[in-house]
């Protein structure tokens, strides 16, 4: 339209969500979507604005990652999600479809209206004939708006048949119960209507509280008015493809921009029940287009996910952040979540790597980037394999010392390389959104050294992106391999031998007098600078331009190192007694105690190596190792009744016992099982021990006796592996260290 006809306002946008999706008449290969903006002006007054975007089937498939999706399927799913009374959890059916839908709609929005920035001053232009936003521009009418929080606590008692949960888990044995609960609610939505609910919301200006014995009836207790919390706003619109104007009815938050919910008390079913109640209330009257009611989070995946989040894709229209209630840095975590939300247009972590580029765009970017590299690096890329040992001078078991040893790392190197390679291969992207997405990746890399939230996003974004594109994983792995080769070449010229690592982090020993600390300090610094310079030169020669100057960090200096496996290594500085243990599993409190025993024992054992009779040293070392195991077991005996101490974390990808039927009766406790499951073995009597998920039962725990012997045998196997490696590495012994637990100590736990 003619820009002279646009009506401009100066506002900021605090949230963008999906309102409606439809097929225009006779359309088969594209759909339209209505997007809701929560805006506010310089005075803080809220405004509801809308934009209409068009998305083609090709764009949808690019973001979906395959051709197995159609615009008709997307529209059908979105239409079903507008009736939460019948379909309150539509994204459970296909979370990937909803990720693709949300990502491609946001991409279309920026392509068709201009890049949108959250909480930043903007000029927003609307077409007065349609009431729709058609243009967005950055402005400088004021400082960025500070996001405002409201504290939300919601608890619901949703009566779900334990047999329904058991049926879901029987279909998916690796399922997490947070997903199973939502799946059961999806299958029987009437149980959400009968739920009891308690909610408390505190904003900067209001307190809102409700208590429902059942959501089918009015609350039995109430404090504060709904109007103090939100404003119900109706806006007349004339979207394309509609014969007449439609009315959008939305909520505008008053004096806040997002909800914060304590992680330990957060319950996705409770929040869905609350928002469902609001949706039903607000849209009870006819005359308005019903909005999409859809969410994403680890609970919406069968196997869950390790990081909790709750993404609001549609109604009510603004985000909810979950943070651990006991975290000392809870305030910083909330600020970080809000910053990540603003930086990534509200799409992270809901859409994953799609926040940068659609999955189908990455192979072309990776191929173009690889074509820009020098032949030697291209060869390293072609040879790279995930199982390849990149740096492994010492084959475990091995021990070195006394000799000056150092650990180094390139902080954030993989993320920097990803951004640089994406920029190298993305210059030919036809889609402007591609360049916008790459610019967001750049901004994250630039912010990461000073902003912990950006580093946390990159820690997940890099592997997510590589998982979405094997060619990109190959490229990044090959470039890291080339970095490793340069590290090894440079090390040989600076009295340094690299013993292990992967390029991003590595360690090695120095050819310096073990007694001369000053000389060692100088040589280590010379090596650090030389490697840093050489790796930087290799990357620049391949046109890989990092966003930050390459920095090789010294993580520790030691005098001894013991390696017992590819990942297992212990470093010790006998001068100041500092150490570092890597590769020992810390699956629970008992494992953490065992790690402390291992570290203390290794210090004592390596202190023997100055003696003159190696054979006697080895015998003495075995005695010290057995004594250490004795002490560990005697200490464990004092904790034999402590189920928390013996619990171990199990991921969905690890084999575990079937859940006992009583585990399905935990109610809202099950909502917290997003990914990790803490299991303790117990002896119910009359048979073998079984694994019990301790977090699925109320406190205080009432359980059969803990099978401490089972847990100790698993822990002792890890300790035996370490001690065997020490004996072989230091004294060249070929025999294993085996602690005689069954003969010596098992009677304590009989």
Curated annotation (Swiss-Prot):
Subunit relationships: Associates with the primase and the helicase to form the helicase-primase complex. Interacts with the origin-binding protein. Interacts with the polymerase catalytic subunit.
A single GO CC term for this protein reads:
host cell nucleus
For this UniProt record, give its keywords in alphabetical order, as a comma-separated list: DNA replication, Host nucleus
Please verify whether the record's keywords include Transit peptide: no
Organism for this UniProt entry? Human herpesvirus 1 (strain 17) (HHV-1)
Asked if the keyword Nucleus belongs to this entry, the reply reads no
Function statement:
Component of the helicase/primase complex. Unwinds the DNA at the replication forks and generates single-stranded DNA for both leading and lagging strand synthesis. The primase synthesizes short RNA primers on the lagging strand that the polymerase presumably elongates using dNTPs. The primase-associated factor has no known catalytic activity in the complex and may serve to facilitate the formation of the replisome by directly interacting with the origin-binding protein and the polymerase.
InterPro entries, per database record: HSV_HEPA
Its protein name is DNA helicase/primase complex-associated protein
């Amino acid at each position: 339209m003619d820009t002279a006809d646009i009506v401009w306002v100066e506002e900021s946008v605090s949230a963008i969500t999906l309102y409606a999706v439809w097929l225009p008449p006779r359309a088969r290969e594209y759909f339209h979507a209505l997007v809701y903006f929560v805006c506010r002006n310089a005075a803080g007054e809220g405004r509801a604005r809308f934009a209409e975007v068009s998305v083609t089937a090709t764009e949808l498939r690019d973001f979906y990652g395959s051709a197995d999706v159609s615009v008709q399927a997307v529209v059908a799913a979105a239409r079903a999600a507008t009736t939460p009374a019948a379909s309150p959890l539509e994204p459970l059916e296909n979370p990937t479809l909803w990720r693709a839908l949300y990502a491609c709609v946001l991409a279309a929005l920026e392509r068709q209206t201009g890049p949108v920035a959250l909480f930043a001053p903007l000029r927003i232009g609307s077409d007065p004939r349609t009431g729709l936003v058609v243009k967005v521009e950055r402005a400088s009418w004021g400082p960025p708006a500070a996001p405002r929080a409201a504290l939300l606590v919601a608890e619901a008692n949703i009566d779900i048949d334990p047999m329904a949960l058991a049926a879901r888990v029987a279909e998916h044995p690796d399922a997490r119960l947070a997903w199973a609960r939502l799946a059961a609610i999806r299958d029987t939505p009437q149980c959400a209507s009968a739920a009891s609910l308690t909610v408390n919301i505190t904003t900067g200006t209001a307190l809102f509280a409700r208590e429902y014995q059942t959501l089918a009836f009015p609350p039995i207790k109430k404090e504060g008015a709904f109007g103090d919390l939100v404003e119900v706003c109706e806006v007349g619109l004339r979207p394309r493809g509609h014969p007449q104007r439609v009315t959008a009815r939305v909520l505008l938050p008053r004096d806040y921009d997002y909800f914060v919910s304590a992680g330990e008390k957060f319950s996705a079913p409770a929040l869905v029940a609350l928002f469902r109640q609001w949706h039903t209330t607000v849209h009870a009257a006819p005359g308005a287009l019903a909005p999409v009611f859809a969410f994403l989070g680890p609970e919406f995946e069968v196997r869950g996910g390790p990081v909790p989040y709750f993404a609001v894709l549609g109604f009510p229209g603004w985000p909810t952040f979950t943070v651990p209630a006991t975290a000392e840095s809870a305030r910083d975590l909330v600020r970080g979540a809000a910053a990540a939300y603003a930086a990534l247009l509200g799409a992270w972590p809901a859409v994953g790597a799609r926040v940068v580029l659609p999955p189908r765009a990455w192979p072309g970017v990776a191929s173009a980037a690889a074509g820009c590299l020098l032949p030697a690096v291209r060869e390293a890329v072609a040879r790279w394999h995930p199982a390849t040992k990149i740096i492994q001078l010492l084959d475990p078991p091995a021990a070195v010392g006394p000799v000056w040893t150092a650990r180094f790392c390139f902080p954030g190197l993989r993320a920097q390389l990803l951004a640089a390679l994406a920029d190298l291969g993305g210059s030919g992207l036809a889609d402007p959104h591609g360049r916008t997405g790459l610019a967001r990746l750049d901004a994250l890399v630039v912010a990461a050294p000073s902003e912990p939230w950006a580093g946390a996003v990159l820690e997940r974004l890099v592997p997510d992106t590589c998982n979405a594109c094997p060619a990109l994983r190959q490229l990044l792995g090959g470039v890291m391999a080339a970095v490793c080769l340069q590290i090894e070449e440079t090390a040989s010229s600076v009295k340094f031998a690299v013993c292990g690592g992967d390029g991003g982090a590595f360690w090695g020993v120095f050819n310096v007098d073990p007694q001369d600390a000053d000389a060692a300090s100088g040589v280590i610094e010379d090596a650090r600078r030389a490697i840093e310079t050489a790796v930087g030169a290799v990357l620049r020669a391949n046109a890989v331009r990092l966003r930050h100057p390459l920095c090789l960090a010294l993580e520790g200096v030691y005098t001894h190192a013991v390696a017992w496996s590819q990942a297992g290594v212990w470093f010790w500085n006998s001068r100041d007694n500092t150490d570092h243990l890597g590769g020992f599993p810390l699956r629970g409190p008992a494992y953490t105690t065992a790690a402390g025993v291992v570290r203390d024992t290794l210090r004592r054992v390596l202190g023997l190596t100055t003696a003159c009779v190696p054979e006697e040293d080895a015998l003495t070392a075995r005695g010290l190792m057995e004594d250490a195991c004795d002490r560990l077991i005697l200490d464990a005996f004092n904790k034999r009744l402590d189920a928390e101490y013996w619990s171990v974390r199990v991921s969905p990808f690890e084999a575990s016992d079937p859940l006992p039927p009583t585990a399905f009766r935990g109610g809202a406790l099950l909502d917290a099982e997003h990914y990790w499951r803490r299991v303790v073995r117990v002896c119910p009597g009359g048979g073998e021990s079984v694994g019990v998920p301790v977090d699925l039962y109320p406190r205080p725990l009432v359980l059969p006796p803990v099978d401490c012997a089972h847990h100790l045998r698993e822990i002792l196997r890890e300790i035996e592996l370490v001690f065997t490696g020490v004996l072989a590495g230091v004294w060249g012994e070929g025999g294993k260290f085996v602690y005689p637990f069954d003969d010596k100590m098992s009677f304590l736990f009989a």
